[in-house]
Amino acid sequence: MSKNFNHEDFSHWIFDLDNTLYPASVNLFGQINTKMSNYIMKLVNVDQETAEKMRAEYWEKYGTSLAGLMQNYEIDPKDFLKVVHDIDFSVLPKDLDLLDALNNLPGRKLVYTNGTVPYAREVLKYRGLLSVFNEIYGIEDAGYIPKPFPEAFEIIFSKAKIVPNSSAMFEDEERNLVVPFKLGLKTILVSNVKSNEKYVNYSIKHLSDFLRRITSNPLK
């Protein structure tokens, strides 16, 4: 990088929720995927295999399966999200190490998820991280327009008063970092699969380790 990553230069830290603020190995989203497939089976009257294919195709094309269902079947997003977020959160372990690392970051800490705010609050509560975040934004705050679409980021970043060149975005999905990078944010992919995309400034496996590193010494 041409400039060091000095944590003192940042005023806003924006974190995705699912598979970013908890490990993907927990497979919380596996529960949600099952609920979504069941919803589609009943809505469209198709078998499980077809429903799972539709769910995946809608996610790829529309950003979320919900967005695809809204576009093609005009469903009530509130009803859908209430159903698919009725899951067992107790599989989420508390993470005091991550809590400590987040507490050491200066500035404001935000969660921005394609889930809902109530869902995000439940996840953070079970992880023991709820108290550390200043603001939480969900898909409902963007009029149900999901990441990775530019309109979604424009709406949320405007509401949160994000200053791009002094903000960082953490995500587990590469495609959700394209717009933040173009806007001037520092972008960090949290994934076991390393990224070499130019719009990913840092590709990391362990969030808490990375946060400790940047609060100890500036990164290049």
Q: What are the residue ranges of the model-derived segments?
A:
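Asp-based, Mg2+/Mn2+-dependent phosphohydrolase catalytic module
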Residues: 1-10, 116-220
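Hydrophobic residues in well-ordered beta-strands that form the structural core
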Residues: 23, 111-113, 189
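N-terminal helical cap/lid subdomain that shapes the substrate entry/recognition surface
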Residues: 3-15, 20-97, 118
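Short glycine/serine/threonine/alanine-rich loop segments
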Residues: 46, 75, 107, 162, ...
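Well-formed, non-transmembrane alpha-helical positions, independent of function
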Residues: 68, 101-104, 179
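Substrate-recognition element of Asp-dependent hydrolases with the DxDx(T/V) motif
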Residues: 79-93, 99-127, 133-139
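A generic structural signal for short
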Residues: 25, 54-55, 108-109, 141-142, ...
